[in-house]
Amino acid sequence: TAPMAPPRSMAAPRVQGPQTAIVVGEGEIDCDEHGRILVRFHWDLDGALSMRCRVSQSWAGNGWGSVVIPRVGMEVVVEFLDGDPDKPLVTGCVYNGQNAAPHDLPAGKTRTVWRSNSHQGQGFNEISFEDQAGSELLHMQAQRDHSTVVGHDARHQTGHDRQASVANDQSEHIGRDNTLTIGRNHSANVAGD
């Protein structure tokens, strides 16, 4: 005879709506091989860690897409797929009294900023946009090195002045021809040989 199990008297638990939590873990950045993180919910008075939570990304393909790992101490928004408490999903991050925006608000409300934070350092990389009419600006900062790879042609057009300053050495290699057209004056100062 087959064993009989009594019918379940209680429905499986469900979590309704999003919650916020604090990212926890070892060091400054803690994730597994799938980019999952650990969080602690505000109601968790014992300070227990959650299971690893998947992190929603703006793009996620096979070997391509975007990867932004929330760091320890950040406040994140957690949803539960189909309300299942065993399926947490981090859907975003929020600023709070502990973690402020990268520029003053509302004074900088016309700026869109993408700023990172150097791991175990004091610097940052940044791409920012100023959208105030008459002051529009695209700003890029590399805390250390900047590398650009172009697979075919590269074109740059400047509508007014252009300045470049190199604090150390500069080298240039041209595989074939070089053409330079100057509409007015050209001056060069060489201090050494």
Could you say what each language-model-derived stretch is?
Residues A5-V15:
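Short aromatic-glycine motifs in intrinsically disordered, low-complexity regions
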Residues P18-D193:
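Structural signature for extended repeat/solenoid scaffolds and their inter-repeat hinge/linker regions
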Residues M4-P7, Q122-F124:
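Surface-exposed acidic, glycine/proline-enriched linker/cap segments
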